[in-house]
């Protein structure tokens, strides 16, 4: 919807400005992307691909948009990528983004043939939109990573599939795997 597009576009613009030149690309996914009637309190879901973690977090700290030490956020990014942050400029009056922050190298590994887990893979083989790239080469690189990940869906799901499957079963199993290890605030209903 137009309201979602407007909020997402404004958040991207501010995030890129506050990111200090470290953002290479931004992908949008989730309820705002697929239009499943997110309410006004729903965060816009972004994957923020950065050139360097320290530069990105230092820039957000300088802009007053990060409330943790730069060294901690940059360090944790190397231990367990992606970091997840809330980006809420103007105290969230213009919208809130849930940002999965990942370097190009970590994104390539997460979407490759031997990922450490299914966290990013399960999200990014779904419908996503490339909403920002600093260069057309960055955009092409991201699209290539997504295409490769999507081509490998059956290979990474194969050990978890039992019996005959259809598209619905495949999609459900993919979501179960990618979200299964999370503690989520949403209702269990």
Can you say where each PLM-predicted feature lies in the sequence?
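Catalytic core of pol beta-like nucleotidyltransferases
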Residues: 1-22, 27, 33-41, 50-189
């Amino acid at each position: 919807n137009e309201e979602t597009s407007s909020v997402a576009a404004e958040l991207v613009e501010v995030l890129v400005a506050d990111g200090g030149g470290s953002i290479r690309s931004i992908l949008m996914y989730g309820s705002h992307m697929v239009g499943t009637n997110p309410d006004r309190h729903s965060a816009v879901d972004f994957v923020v691909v950065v050139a360097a973690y320290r530069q990105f977090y230092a820039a957000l700290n300088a802009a007053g948009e990060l409330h943790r030490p730069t060294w901690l956020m940059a360090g944790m990014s190397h231990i367990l990528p992606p970091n997840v942050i809330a980006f809420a400029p103007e105290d969230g009056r213009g919208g809130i983004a849930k940002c999965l922050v990942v370097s190009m190298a970590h994104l390539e590994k997460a979407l490759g043939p031997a990922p450490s887990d299914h966290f990013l893979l399960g999200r990014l083989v779904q419908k996503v939109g490339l909403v920002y790239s600093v260069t057309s080469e960055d955009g092409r690189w991201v699209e290539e990573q997504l295409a490769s990940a999507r081509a490998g869906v059956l290979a990474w799901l194969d050990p978890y599939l039992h019996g005959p499957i259809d598209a619905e079963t495949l999609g459900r199993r993919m979501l179960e795997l990618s979200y299964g290890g999370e503690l989520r605030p949403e209702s269990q209903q």
